[in-house]
Amino acid sequence: MNSSVLLGEGFTLMFLGMGFVLAFLFLLIFAIRGMSAAVNRFFPEPVPVPKAAPAAAPADDFARLKPVIAAAIHHHRRLNP
């Protein structure tokens, strides 16, 4: 066989293989989209219920943490002079 014939057959095989892989990937994409649509159709996600705001929410989180931070600093300084 001639080297140009072998090169031509190699390119033919390469493009056929790449074409089959591309076709399979497109088929896989459409199958996954179809399954996703079927699952969403038969098992829809529940609508989230809005949560009510707490009645006595502190205005500032730092105001609640200030005594805790001060106690932690005092404890650290007492143990590590």
Curated annotation (Swiss-Prot):
It is found in: Cell membrane. One of its GO terms (cellular component) is plasma membrane. One of its GO terms (molecular function) is decarboxylation-driven active transmembrane transporter activity. It is an enzyme of class 7 (translocase). Its cofactor is Na(+). GO terms for biological process: sodium ion export across plasma membrane. The chain crosses the membrane at residues 12-32. Its main location: membrane. It catalyses: oxaloacetate + 2 Na(+)(in) + H(+) = pyruvate + 2 Na(+)(out) + CO2. Keywords: Cell membrane, Ion transport, Membrane, Sodium, Sodium transport, Translocase, Transmembrane, Transmembrane helix, Transport. Its EC number is 7.2.4.2. Heterotrimer of an alpha, a beta and a gamma subunit. Catalyzes the decarboxylation of oxaloacetate coupled to Na(+) translocation. Belongs to the OadG family. HAMAP family: OadG. This is Oxaloacetate decarboxylase gamma chain 3. The lineage of its organism: Bacteria, Pseudomonadati, Pseudomonadota, Gammaproteobacteria, Enterobacterales. The gene is oadG3.
